[in-house]
Amino acid sequence: MRRRDVVKLAALSAAGLVLPKTVRAAAKQIPVIDTHIHLFDTTRTWGVPWPAKDDLALFKPALPPRYVDLSAKHGVVGAIAIEASPLKSDNDWLLKVVAENPVMVGMIGDLIPGTPSYMADLERLQKNPLFLGIRYGNIWDRDLSIDLDKPGFVDGLKALAKAGLTFDSANPDEKLLAALLKTSEQIPDLRIVVDHLPHAVVPAEATEQKQHFDRLQALAKNPRVFVKLSEIPILVDGTLVTDPSAYTEHLDAIWEIFGEDHILFGSDWPNSDHVAPYDATFSIVQQYISGKSAKAGEKYFWKNSIAAYRWRPRRANQHLASI
């Protein structure tokens, strides 16, 4: 079953995403933390590795003030930047941008475990409390399933775990999910965040589909594994599917496996602009979460991000008690 197969043609109505007043009121009581945004400045004299110049949807500065303009009305009070560059120097660039903008509660950097400078870079970066971990996976032509066997790689991840930092994945497929399961078994005290799980293709063949869900069940047994309900919106024939019910079956399957204590909100802004504007991205997931308890919503939008990333509030409104 491919993810798009979950969307029934009958559900492709152009339903508006207007939340009931009770849901909007409840949402305002929860300080929302967006655990997945990308920051870059396309006006830098030395350029950016991503996005490409011909990417008309993305190639413009994506910096905190622009993000706040889009997200604040939805109750977002903080965000975590996920590095979008393989350049080691961009860890410092991103840390500087994050430090200058208190709406940012931290960042996930880009380092390659096992490389000669990795341990020194990790030791230096972790001294900054805004540095929350690293991202690795299907990005920059990397392959976790192969790299786990390279000298020093696992030791590098063990050092990450010892430092109390988080290991974010990138763009899951079956091969990466298997590698993440292996990682969680080899380093059970490493906090792992599986990003964009709703976007992963569920195999159509019965045996492969069972393996997929068995793998997720095995990952979920580790209490240090979290997943992001990110990259949710989809297009059908070039049109955004706005009916929240079209997403329910797929999201319910993930929710049932991982439970309300291990699922996080992430918008994937501005990469999400390829499919939907921020308002629609947020509204789709908000309507889904509105079917859960208030406690579950609080965990999804706020508390679970603290458990996964150990970020520290920088503003009063990033505390639930202040809302």
Regions found by a protein language model. Give the residues of each.
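Divalent metal-dependent hydrolysis catalytic cores, especially in the metallo-beta-lactamase
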Residues: 51-86, 104-112, 132-139, 165-168
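Catalytic pocket-lining loop regions of alpha/beta-barrel enzymes
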Residues: 147-264, 313-323
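Active-site gating/metal-coordination segments in enzymes
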Residues: 88-175, 181-182, 228-234, 239-241
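Active-site metal-binding loops of divalent metal-dependent hydrolases
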Residues: 37, 84, 197, 268-269
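Short, electropositive alpha-helical surface patch
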Residues: 89-103, 247-254, 278-288
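Mid-to-C-terminal alpha-helical segments outside catalytic/metal-binding sites
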Residues: 2-19, 30-35, 60-78, 252-253, ...
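Conserved, mostly hydrophobic/aromatic
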Residues: 36, 94, 160, 227, ...
